[in-house]
Amino acid sequence: YEYRDVVPKGYVRVFAALTALMDRGVKVYFFQGNHDVWTYSYFEELGMIRLEQPALMEIGGKTFCIGHGDGLGPVPMGYRFLRGMFHNRVLQFLFSLLHPWIAFRLGNGWSRGNRLSRHEEYVFKGESEPLYKFAAEFEKKHKVDHFIFGHYHCEVDMKTPGGATFHV
């Protein structure tokens, strides 16, 4: 969560390192993911460029479709409901009333509990994965050479039906 006047302990050095890169002319891009739902303007204040997903960009004559990956493709009803709650302005306001110590403990506990409850690495479901389905549909309307996403925290390299590379 992004408070107006508080930077979470342990992250200042990361922000300082990113700022040092930007001071040397390196552009730093940021995609909001499922753990970053409540970031607002702080990254832009630091000089980062926030991109909405999916972002189409041309690099070296090739077209890339890049994004975090969260929420792209067909999403199960339960997850859609949860995403709706996290994107709700009233709930965001109510959460902002919590002291940062409480809010960060809740957020970190939720995140850690979610990861630890699986007890194993995520196994990508191939062509039945919602993100892959998104890419297969997206390339029907846009010429794309490479899809690059995160979100699943696993390594995937495969081809889409249209021949683009699909990387997670």
Give the positions of each predicted feature.
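Conserved beta-sheet core of the metallophosphoesterase superfamily
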Residues: 46-53, 63-65, 70, 75-82, ...
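Active-site-proximal loop/helix segment associated with metal-binding centers of metalloenzymes
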Residues: 69-130
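Core catalytic region of metal-dependent phosphoesterases/phosphodiesterases
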Residues: 1-59
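Short C-terminal domain-edge/linker segments immediately following a structured domain
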Residues: 20-25, 59-63, 94-101
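Membrane-proximal helix-turn-helix segments that form the acceptor-binding/catalytic region
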Residues: 19, 113, 134
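A broad, low-specificity signal for short, low-complexity segments enriched in glycine/proline
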Residues: 13-14, 22-30, 106-110, 125-130, ...
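Short, charge-rich amphipathic segments
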Residues: 12-23, 67-76, 116
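Short, surface-exposed linear patches
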Residues: 12-15, 51-53, 73, 86-90, ...
